[in-house]
Design a protein with these regions (language model features):
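Charged docking surfaces used in two-component/phosphorelay signaling
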Residues: 21-29
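Non-catalytic signal-transmission and effector/linker regions of two-component phosphorelay proteins
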Residues: 1-11, 24, 115-134
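Receiver (REC) domain active-site loop signature in two-component systems and cognate sites
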Residues: 61
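Active-site beta3 strand of CheY-like receiver
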Residues: 50-56
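Conserved acidic carboxylate
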Residues: 14
């Protein structure tokens, strides 16, 4: 987290507008600053520009899917340190394996309860802080 920030910044990459607004509202209500992206390409651009503390990345998006966007973010020295949580409706083990394979730091199955989302985001932020102190 950038020290001058009062609240952790979460970049939410989700192409479905209703879901994007719902998750954004959950997170803002819980004390996070939230910026959004509509597709994987926009998520990469915004991540480089904003340097968020965490990215919630929908797996299935137009232009560039979340898996490829995650690969590119983890390959870039400017963004590889940012924790990424996969956000997907696919709860199967294959989706979890794919998330790990592309570099995601965690997995959130949607729809999810607001408290579950916030708990996973906080846990990923805590894990990211621990890694950065090593």
């Amino acid at each position: 987290m950038i020290p001058s920030r009062k609240q952790p910044l979460v970049l939410l990459a989700e192409d479905f507008e209703d879901a994007r607004e719902l998750y954004r509202d959950y997170l803002q209500f819980s004390g996070f600053d939230v910026e959004t992206a509509n597709n994987g390409r926009e998520a990469i651009t915004r991540a480089v520009e904003l340097q968020p503390d965490l990215i919630l990345m929908d797996a299935s998006m137009p232009v560039l899917d979340g898996w490829q966007a995650t690969r590119e973010l983890k390959a870039n020295p400017v963004t590889r340190h940012i924790p990424i949580l996969a956000l997907t409706a696919h709860a199967f083990d294959d989706a979890r394996r794919e998330a790990r394979a592309v570099g995601c730091d965690g997995f959130v199955t949607k729809p999810c309860l607001p408290d579950d989302l916030v708990t996973k985001v906080r846990a990923a932020l805590d894990n990211g802080r621990k890694k950065s102190k090593r």
